Structure formats: structure tokens, C-alpha cells
Amino acid sequence: MYVAGFAPDAGESIGQIGEWLPSPALGNVEWDSDGYVWIKQDKFHESFCQDLPTDEALVMAVTQKAPVGSIFGETISDPAWKKKPTWYQVSRDDRMIPPVTERRMAERMKPRRTIELDSSHASLASQPGAIVDLIVEAAASIS
């Protein structure tokens, strides 16, 4: 299950995928002295979850879990999506991963189903019902 997420191929890194079409919110991201990557708190709402209420975005901004920046350069050796059934959700209004990039990853994965939602990167929070429906569909098909 991929929810507006990266899906690298063998020998490919997240950073390489990010070069296909840079994120519109790239300028709102910063690295800290420990090598973690954060979305600037004052830019979080407009960058990550513009379809959520301001108060929810603020909570997400101050509790965000920053990835270590080195993950962007690590290559994948054996992507699970080549061996396992997959489903992909594209966020049409994503500012973190461009929707064009999400579609390109989904197309090459040949998922059992791809859905598109009018949502930000935070589709799990803004469209939980649609995400649950996709998960239930996926679970039912492999049970």
C-alpha cells in the first residue's frame, strides 16, 4: 500500500526520484545539525497539509517526525512492489511529492489499483475514509 509515497526501483534512491520534478515545497524544508530533514513549522500547513484546518496543521507541524537526510541517497536493492501486490493512492494537490511523480511511480509498479484524491500530501488525515476503503479492498483481495 502506497499512500502518496515514494516507490523506488532497484538501484534507485528517493533523492533520484525527487530530481524527476522537484517538490514545489522544497524551499520550505531544512536540515538540522544532526542531519534530520524538517518542514519549517511556519510553512508546514501550506507545504504538507493545506487541505486540513489550521489547528490540525499546527499540531502536525510541532509533532512532525523528521527523517534522517541520508535516506534520500540510499538506493533500494529489491523493491517489494515487484514481488507483492500493490495499491497506490495519488494526491492530486500534493506539494511534497508532485502528483506527476506519484503517477509515474504508480504506473511503473502496475498496482492492482490506483486511486487519485483531491488532497494534500496528508491524505491519511484529510481523506481517511477513502484511504480506509482502499486498505479494506486490498486486504480483502489477498485474504
Question: PLM features: residue spans?
Answer:
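Catalytic active-site module of serine/aspartate enzymes centered on a nucleophile-bearing elbow/loop
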Residues: 110-143
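Helix-loop "lid/cap" segments that line or gate small-molecule binding pockets
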Residues: 42-51
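Conserved alpha/beta-hydrolase "acid-adjacent" motif
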Residues: 95-101, 127
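Flexible "cap/lid" loop of the alpha/beta hydrolase fold
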Residues: 2-41, 68-71
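Active-site nucleophile elbow and catalytic-triad environment of alpha/beta-hydrolase enzymes
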Residues: 62-80
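Short, proline-enriched alpha-helix->beta-strand connector loops that line the catalytic pocket
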Residues: 81-86, 109-112
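Conserved strand-to-loop "acid loop" that flanks and positions the catalytic carboxylate
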Residues: 85-94, 118
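Short alpha-helix in the alpha/beta-hydrolase fold that links the catalytic acid
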Residues: 74, 99-105
